[in-house]
Amino acid sequence: MTSLQQQQQQQRVKYGPPHHIKRRPYHPILESLEFQTNQHLIQEYSLDIVNTLSQLESLTLVNPAMIDLQPEIQWFMRPFLLDFLIELHSSFKLQPTTLFLCLNIIDRYCAKRIVFKRHYQLVGCTALWIASKYEDKKSRVPTLKELTIMCRNAYDEEMFVQMEMHILSTLDWSIGHPTLEDCLQLAIDSNNLSNNTTNDIENKSVRPNRKSSISSAVTAVARFLCELSLYDKYFLSVPPSLIAITANLLSCSMLQIPHASITLKNLIEQEIINPQQKKQKKAFSSNSSRTTTASYTHQNQSDVRHSSFDEDIDLDSGDEGDDDEDYIDEFYETNNYDDTNATTFDESINKSTTINDENQPPQIHTPFLSGLDEDSILSIKKICLMLIIQLSKVTEVLSKKYENLGVIQVINNFHSNYKFIIQSIYENQELLLNTINDSTNNNEIDYKLIQSSEILLQFPKFDEYLTEDEDENVSTDDEANSQPQGYDGSGSDGNNQLFTPKSPNAFSSNSSLTLNNHPQSMVPVTPPSATSQYSLFSNKNNRTHESTSGLNSTCNTPTHISISSFAPPQPPPGSILKPKLTSINSTNSLKIKKLTSNSNSSNINIHHGHHNTKQEKRYSHISIGSNSSSKYDGFSPIKSISTNGSLITNNGSFTNIVNNTNSSSPLMNQQQQYYHQQQHQQQVTQSSLYQHHHQYHQ
């Protein structure tokens, strides 16, 4: 019986879809043929695709001022919802475009309808459901049961259906939008990255349609920056194409790839610099022709009347009939011909076409969907500054998502290479946010901040092409500041040169963007790690003097990951980075180390006994030996070097070393020179006091 039952069970018919089917590998020849035909079809419709995306970009922009009018929803709730949607997106393994389209649907709906606090999560999940239907395949679309489970049964299945109908009717059933992923792919394709993969059909491990390692790395870092831009309010008012272009430039700069900078340079030269140079040449030629004709007519005037002013007053008075004769004489003297009415049919057509071209939309270039002009270039630099500020607010969900891909390590290396510039941006973020949010002063951003964004982006340099404002700023900076040679590529003939990425610090001592501009430095949003340079645990002397009581709840992100490079480094108040030192007479603010010059060291002998006690009382404000080292001595990466080329040890002795000033930044060198001058004056005054005291006791 057992054998018969087993046979019957084996012969039972199973209904439904088959289970546990092994996937067969797709044939490489078919894959290569499909890839080639797909690329051929896309190239035929490339112009139509770009034009459609540019039209959708202008139609689907979100006004953040309308979201400000929401009675219950606040901007600090956005990161919480976004973290939840990122977790859902990664758990369902949806396409990257789905997440960006979901956020656009949420913002467009919140800009038109009032959303209550209890329905904010319902709107987000329904928008993700709509976007997955629009972008992903059917098997990846989450079901209503899964959405209710993810929301912990806070909403019924019918509520998702009702909210879907309400969102679609509010948006007039127009869901299409050029997402950040679409614009990012256009920007990466314009980089012309070399494809390292081969079309070898026999090698099945390498697919012909797989991107190269370079393009995949650029895509990962740029996608991280695009997702980071979703957290802030400012990026809603900027076209997504410019955000994607900035993310592409910044990712190539982080990976030290020059392709994006080269393509941007070629575009700017073709579309901005060359037309302006042609206009300038035409204007110069027209002005020169006018001057030459004027000189020739002046030379041809043989009958010039030389008379006094009194004689010219009554000249031709009463001879009104001679006006026509005077006009005829002037006409033959100048030999000018009025051709206002002598135009042909072709010339009239050309004039009408030029007039109509002025009212046409700007010409679309492949990554720039909103047009390429000087305003778009300036907005790219602003977006770069805002992305650098957003790097200090990375949430734990976003960092875990990209940690396995190596994106976090790339950003840490980028921060360590440009830490002085990034630190200055963090110091002046309040000024930057005020100027960006203010509509009247939108274009009045500090030139040093713009220059720092150019360094971070590896922005192409144009030595011949500078605007009038940049010429004035560069000339005033060169006159006011005397920077050492070797920086920014400016030697003896280094005027009007922008800073190169090889010199990470682009600031001078006379600038308002000093590293310690504010008396209270900003508390880092993310706690520093134990291995970082600016960590509180990196130095043994820094254990008991610091506390985290200064942290408050004003941050707009829910949970921050402890990555030291994302947090703005905090310069201590007593470090060498301070731009202005106090006077020598102030005993509380400045402590002088007990030093003796090499020339007077053999002649000065301080006796032991009660004289030393008096001397210690008299010079109690002078710190001696190891007591002089404050808790912030280990902060600066540049050690303090004395004027005679010797390093000061903790015991008060000297060890002769080579006087090698740090060449990392001109700001540090200028501040060190000022500090050394003050220290030298203090040594001279101190040695004279010791000599006077020694002679008095003798």
Curated annotation (Swiss-Prot):
What segments bear the compositional bias annotation Acidic residues? 310-326, 469-480
**What top-level branch of life does the organism fall under?**
Eukaryota
Listed A to Z, the keywords are: Cell cycle, Cell division, Cyclin
Q: Where is there biased composition of kind Low complexity?
A: 1-11, 670-690
GO BP annotation list: cell division; filamentous growth; regulation of G1/S transition of mitotic cell cycle
Among InterPro entries, the record links this protein to: Cyclin, Cyclin-like_dom, Cyclin-like_sf, Cyclin_C-dom, Cyclin_CLN, Cyclin_N, Cyclins_cyclin-box
User: What GO terms are given for molecular function?
Assistant: cyclin-dependent protein serine/threonine kinase regulator activity
Q: Does the keyword Nuclease apply?
A: no
UniProt feature, compositional bias: Polar residues: 277-302, 493-520, 528-567, 659-669
Q: Does the keyword Cell division apply?
A: yes
Report residue spans for region: Disordered.
Answer: 1-21, 277-326, 469-577, 599-619, 659-698
Q: Which family does it belong to?
A: Belongs to the cyclin family.
Record function comment: Essential for the control of the cell cycle at the G1/S (start) transition. Interacts with the CDC2 protein kinase to form MPF.
Q: Which PANTHER family match?
A: CYCLINS
What's the protein name? G1/S-specific cyclin CCN1
Query: Which organism encodes this protein?
Result: Candida albicans (strain WO-1) (Yeast)
State the organism's lineage. Eukaryota, Fungi, Dikarya, Ascomycota, Saccharomycotina
